[in-house]
A protein has these predicted regions:
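N-terminal pre-ligand scaffold of iron-sulfur
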Residues: 1-60, 74, 90-120
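Short cysteine clusters
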Residues: 45, 65-68
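Short cysteine/histidine-rich metal-coordination sites, predominantly Zn2+-binding motifs
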Residues: 59-66, 79-88
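M16/MPP (pitrilysin/insulinase) zinc-metallopeptidase core fold and M16-derived inactive scaffolds
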Residues: 72-74, 78
């Protein structure tokens, strides 16, 4: 599927061990930074489609879902622990002139890629 890089955020605005959510060409994108490295993953948990932002956490190479606590590796999207949820979709990410750029598909995402807001 063709994809294009989009300029998303200044690198200095994503502190180490933090995450931030964006919508890029309609795609929900999670940008996480740990030990200086940037990662871009889909901002939709594969368990019950929760968004990782704003309450998710970045620790020890993984992002934790705020809804039920599933953890996914930043470098390959794999689910850690016994839960066995599907891996997170990852996007290519690069830093250019101090900006974080993320490559997302040129096609709009389907509903299966969009997060939902849990009922409270
Ligand atoms: S929705 Fe993420 S762990 Fe359940």
């Amino acid at each position: 599927m063709p994809e294009t890089y989009h300029r998303v955020v200044l690198a200095q605005d994503v502190p180490d061990r933090s995450l931030a959510g964006f919508v890029v060409n309609g795609w929900p994108v999670l940008i996480a930074r740990e030990e200086g490295a940037f990662h871009a993953l889909i901002n939709r948990c594969t368990h019950q489609a929760a968004s990782f932002t704003p309450d998710g956490r970045v620790r020890r190479g993984a992002v934790m879902c705020p809804l039920h606590g599933a953890r996914f590796k930043l470098d390959n999207g794999e689910c850690l622990g016994g839960a066995g949820y599907a891996p997170l979709l990852r996007f290519s990410v690069r830093e250019v002139d101090g900006w974080i750029e993320v490559a997302v598909p040129d096609e709009a995402p389907g509903a299966e890629h969009l997060p939902v807001t849990p009922l409270s």
